[in-house]
């Protein structure tokens, strides 16, 4: 019988102080014993490691999910399942989500605690490196939170399994559901509000867009980051103009807000559909499905589809599991401060099932007399489907890659007896990848009795409906007469179209939509301004590429670089595409013709299909002139050349070897692909991502980029310093293939490896006093007694690496080694001891990353500061959208507005007031007054045009149109300004009362930006003159309005107008005008009309 700890509880914390920096971390050894009767055999003891942060603020905190382990043991004790003579011990030490500390904890658990399996890690910072180390040490790793996504290829972690279904699975369910229901046009709406703790938006958003973009028409994609109901409502209103089927990617709290906004907008009529995606959350939507708390459903829920796992809320014992975990967490040793079941992490259920699955697998292997301590054999048993489990999270069955498959259901409000409930409507089989009706008698209660259409009958813009022709007596005769003619034309057209299609097929021109899935719409990429990025240099705009400085594709569409005389590097434009940061490499407009070639299209498709961790991901190309460009993943650290150049100290040997490994692995993949070789290998084409992993770029698409697959190195415009890494046999050719040769890649690797050894950022021949043209001439000279090569010092690195470099740059291509043998040599030259390598690498990585960030910050601080000054100044002069267009280098076209309302005001007696005041006092007076005005108008939908002296000009209805609200907005604002003016006190003349006179007029105007130096947003038209006349003919403390404004206010209702009479207006003759006296319910006092004035006027 396995021994217990000293207390009566089977779970007791044991605190100890570890070595070094872990002395102050809470450590916990969870002693969980399965006590079984033993006859003659000695009990087997298995110690299992557990990795999760202690801090309760973390969503994967031990204090939120740790008791999931104890519940497993309680079940095994109370419900024996024949696990034999085994006792279990779980050890835990806080690693605070630090990759370095997690490594130390894991190594300590393996070497001292002799753990047989690891559950975790729960933090993404440590997942990849611990997964690799666990695979190296043959220790099974159970990922219960889905952090092993970085190791997508199970080859890299062949002892890992993941119990959380991948988010790509729910995207596939959504895709098949939309196909089944026949909905082709969709909108995507969602985000994360300030008070929402949902952290899956980015990952889920990317998975959904990746799964839908090539199969459906995404008419709108809107994200929010605010909890403002007004903003949500405005975004949903805009979405409703172009989409009837709306996919919501958000938390359950935000989903309820959005559905309420739909009710407020009148979108609950049954014409709109809201599809909610649910992966792990247990709050509101679980209550909906389990009918726990929701009794009555609002009408809008009849328009809701919910996609969730089929076992969502229905696992064995699920009803009481969260309650049990919550109770255990509040007891020792966890002593969690959680106060309700809602604070228990839903991942505790996956932790529970992971441990139970491991226990059952151990027992199955014991029965089969297999070594359950062999991690690979144990994981192979799981991947073979030999062990299944009906757990808290539903059926647990793993595929051959160690990933869990979960069936999903589509839930809808259906009739069940005499009430409506959310019940399964469709069922998705994750193994067969098909979707079927849940049952034949399901009766979904849509408001209009049938499934809604994905678009209105006449289209969103009424463009699908035509006016019906008049029905006259002779119409039938006319139509009948033209039927033969129309029939002939239709048949002739069909024959012509058929012939054209056959001709195109014979010419092998690929034209069906499936052949252009790699095309990216340029407007689907959001270009990021510099201050939002943390990379060195400045993005090069499309317009700047053709200036007088030398432009080169340093990474051949991996990272466009622009060189100036001071050798400062400027990176390619960076944008956001489908949630990914991407780099854009612009190609000449002549590529529009090249991309139509079948060979180019096939190669673009091939580039999209190349997937390897050491290859820069290729997203596609934009083919719309003048923005023809190649879109690849953005690598934050720049190129290998930048890493070497910006390093103030010698790069550690472990990093150099790591970079060399990455290059070799990438080239091995390329040489085994249809591309066969790289052809342009050099430091600027070796990009480094934020994880310091090297990825190759700059290969392929030669015909698309240059119009030919051949190139000449003898052109005068060639930058010879870029040819240092090109093999001499290729340099000697009059025309050589752009893709190079495998032997040429070996030579390029040798020069590149020598650059790494010597860490020379300015080329391998920087210590040779000769022009680049001369160096290239000497390299390709076949008669040279000793071929020219860069200097190579023996003491700079391992002797085997130096010898490898010499072999790889051999003059004879046939004598150069191949990359499999190069990889073997690198492995043999690597230091021994995996623990020390990984520990050292993590420490160096943190130091190196911090150093690079300091360099980035230092080099960009001044540029960012200057740019902010310009943007701030521009925002005070022009409307925001005008400023954005000017910054983007676009011209701002004048715009005609059919109806706006303009406000003019000035100060009565301002000239006399100025004569009694000093210039400084006048400036202070105007600043105080117009600062008060500026603050007041912020609560109205108006735009301040300008101030000239004591004149103040405001307009509504532009630059953003607001329908018929402009007169209402200006009138209410004028009343507020008149009210605040009566209480305004002049600083240097407190006894004086400031008197404002105001004029309003409504009519059409033209607005535009005038000038290049100090540009202004100006208004033109007779409406401006008339508004000025209304102000100049007004009286003190009065609002003078024209007849057109009065009509608009009467239509709006609630305003008190008084007829002034007929006055003479310059240039307009006699005009009937009015006084604006007030408004119903206006909350602040206004100056009163005198009785004498009232006698003259007639109240309407």
From Swiss-Prot:
Any idea which UniProt keywords this protein has? Cell membrane, cGMP biosynthesis, Glycoprotein, GTP-binding, Lyase, Membrane, Nucleotide-binding, Receptor, Signal, Transmembrane, Transmembrane helix
User: Which top EC class applies here?
Assistant: lyase
SUPFAM superfamilies given in the database record:
Nucleotide cyclase, Periplasmic binding protein-like I, Protein kinase-like (PK-like)
Ranges annotated as spanning the membrane: 482-502
Chief place where the protein resides:
membrane
Q: Which Pfam families match?
A: ANF_receptor, Guanylate_cyc, PK_Tyr_Ser-Thr
State the name under which the record lists this protein: Guanylate cyclase 2G
């Amino acid at each position: 019988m396995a021994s217990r700890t000293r207390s009566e509880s089977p779970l007791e914390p044991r605190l100890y102080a570890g070595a070094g920096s872990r002395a102050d971390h809470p450590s916990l050894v969870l002693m969980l014993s399965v006590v079984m009767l033993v006859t003659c055999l000695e009990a087997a003891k298995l110690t299992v490691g557990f990795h999760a942060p202690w801090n309760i603020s973390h969503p994967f905190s031990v204090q939120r999910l740790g008791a999931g382990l104890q519940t497993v043991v309680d079940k095994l004790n109370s419900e024996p399942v024949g696990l034999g003579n085994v006792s279990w011990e779980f050890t835990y030490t806080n690693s605070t989500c630090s990759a370095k500390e997690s490594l130390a904890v894991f190594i300590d658990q393996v070497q001292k605690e002799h753990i047989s399996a690891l559950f975790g890690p729960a933090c993404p910072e440590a997942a990849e490196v611990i997964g690799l180390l666990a695979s190296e040490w043959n220790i099974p790793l159970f990922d219960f939170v889905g952090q092993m996504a970085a190791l997508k290829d199970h080859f890299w972690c062949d002892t890992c399994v993941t119990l959380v279904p991948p988010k790509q699975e729910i995207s596939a369910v959504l895709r098949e559901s939309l196909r089944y229901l026949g909905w082709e046009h969709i909108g995507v709406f969602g985000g994360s509000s300030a008070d929402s703790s949902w952290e899956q938006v980015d990952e889920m958003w990317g998975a959904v867009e990746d799964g839908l973009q090539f199969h459906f028409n995404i008419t709108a994609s809107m994200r929010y980051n605010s909890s403002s109901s007004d903003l949500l409502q405005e975004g949903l209103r805009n979405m409703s103009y172009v989409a009837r089927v709306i996919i919501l990617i958000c938390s359950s709290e935000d989903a309820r807000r959005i559905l309420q906004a739909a009710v407020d907008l009148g979108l609950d009529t049954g014409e709109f559909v809201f599809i909610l995606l649910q992966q792990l959350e247990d709050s509101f939507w679980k209550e909906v499905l389990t009918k726990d708390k929701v009794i009555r459903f609002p009408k809008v829920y009849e328009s809701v589809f919910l996609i969730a796992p089929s076992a969502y809320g229905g696992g064995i014992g699920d009803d009481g599991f969260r309650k049990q975990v919550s109770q255990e967490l509040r007891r020792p040793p966890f002593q969690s401060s959680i106060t309700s079941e809602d604070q228990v992490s839903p991942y505790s259920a996956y932790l529970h099932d992971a441990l139970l699955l491991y226990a059952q697998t151990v027992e199955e292997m014991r029965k089969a007399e297999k070594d359950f301590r062999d991690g690979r054999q144990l994981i192979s048993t799981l991947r073979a489907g030999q062990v299944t489990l009906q757990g808290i999270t539903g059926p647990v069955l793993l595929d051959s890659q160690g990933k869990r498959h979960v069936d999903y259901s589509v839930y809808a409000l259906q009739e069940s007896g005499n009430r409506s409930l959310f019940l399964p409507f469709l069922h998705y089989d994750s193994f067969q990848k098909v979707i079927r009706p849940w049952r034949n008698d399901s009766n979904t209660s849509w408001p209009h009795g049938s499934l809604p259409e994905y678009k209105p009958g006449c289209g969103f813009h009424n463009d699908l409906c035509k006016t019906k022709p008049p029905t006259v007596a002779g119409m039938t005769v006319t139509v009948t007469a033209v039927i033969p003619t129309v029939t002939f034309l239709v048949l002739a057209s069909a024959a012509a179209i058929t012939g054209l299609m056959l001709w195109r097929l014979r010419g092998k021109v690929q034209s069906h939509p499936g052949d252009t899935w790699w095309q990216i719409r340029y407007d689907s990429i959001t270009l990021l301004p510099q201050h939002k990025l943390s990379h060195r240099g400045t993005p090069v705009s499309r317009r700047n590429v053709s200036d007088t400085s030398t432009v080169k594709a340093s990474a051949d569409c991996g990272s466009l670089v622009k060189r100036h005389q001071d050798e400062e590097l400027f990176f390619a434009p960076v944008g956001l595409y489908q949630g990914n940061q991407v780099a854009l490499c612009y190609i000449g407009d002549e590529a529009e013709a090249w991309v139509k070639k079948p060979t180019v299209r096939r190669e673009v498709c091939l580039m999209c299909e190349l997937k390897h961790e050491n290859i820069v991901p290729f997203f596609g190309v934009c083919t719309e002139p003048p923005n023809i460009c190649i879109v690849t993943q953005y690598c934050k650290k720049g190129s290998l050349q930048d890493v070497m150049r910006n390093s103030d100290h010698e790069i550690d040997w472990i990093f150099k070897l790591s970079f060399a490994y990455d290059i070799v692995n990438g080239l091995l993949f390329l040489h085994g692909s249809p591309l066969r070789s790289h052809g342009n290998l050099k430091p600027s084409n070796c990009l480094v991502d934020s994880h310091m992993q090297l990825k190759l770029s700059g290969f392929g698409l030669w015909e698309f980029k240059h119009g030919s697959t051949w190139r000449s190195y003898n052109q005068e415009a060639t930058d010879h310093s870029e040819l240092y890494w090109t093999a001499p046999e290729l340099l000697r050719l009059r025309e050589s293939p752009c893709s190079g040769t495998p032997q040429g890649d070996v030579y390029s690797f040798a020069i590149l490896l020598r650059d790494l050894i010597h860490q020379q950022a300015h080329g391998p021949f920087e210590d040779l006093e000769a022009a680049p043209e001369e160096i290239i001439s000497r390299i390709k000279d076949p008669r040279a007694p000793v071929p020219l090569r860069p200097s190579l010092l023996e003491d700079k690195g391992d002797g085997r690496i130096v010898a490898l470099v010499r072999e790889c740059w051999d003059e004879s291509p046939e004598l150069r080694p191949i990359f499999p043998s190069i990889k073997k040599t690198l492995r043999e030259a690597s230091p021994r001891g995996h623990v020390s390598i990984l520990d050292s690498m993590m420490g160096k990585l943190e130091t190196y990353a911090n150093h690079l960030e300091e360099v980035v910050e230092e080099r960009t601080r001044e540029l960012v500061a200057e740019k902010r000054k310009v943007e701030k100044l521009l925002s005070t002069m022009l409307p925001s959208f005008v400023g954005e267009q000017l910054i983007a280098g676009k011209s701002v076209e004048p715009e005609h507005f059919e109806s706006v309302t303009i406000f003019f005001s000035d100060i009565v007696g301002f000239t006399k007031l100025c004569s009694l005041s000093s210039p400084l006092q006048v400036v202070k007076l105007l600043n105080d007054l117009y600062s008060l005005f500026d603050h007041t108008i912020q609560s109205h939908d108006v735009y301040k045009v300008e101030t000239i002296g004591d004149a103040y000009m405001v307009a509504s209805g532009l630059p953003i149109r607001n329908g018929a609200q402009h007169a209402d907005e200006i009138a209410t604002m004028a009343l507020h300004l008149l009210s605040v003016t009566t209480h305004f006190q002049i600083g240097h003349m407190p006894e004086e009362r400031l008197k404002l006179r105001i004029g309003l007029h409504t009519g059409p105007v033209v607005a535009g930006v005038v000038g290049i130096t100090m540009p202004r947003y100006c208004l033109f038209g007779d409406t401006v003159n008339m508004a000025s006349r209304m102000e100049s003919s007004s009286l003190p403390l009065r609002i003078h309005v024209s007849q057109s404004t009065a009509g608009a206010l009467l239509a709006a209702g609630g305003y008190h107008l008084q007829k002034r009479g007929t006055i003479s207006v310059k240039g307009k003759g006699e005009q009937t005008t009015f006084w604006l006296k007030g408004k119903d319910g206006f909350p602040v006092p206004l100056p009163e009309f005198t009785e004498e004035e009232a006698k003259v006027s007639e109240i309407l």
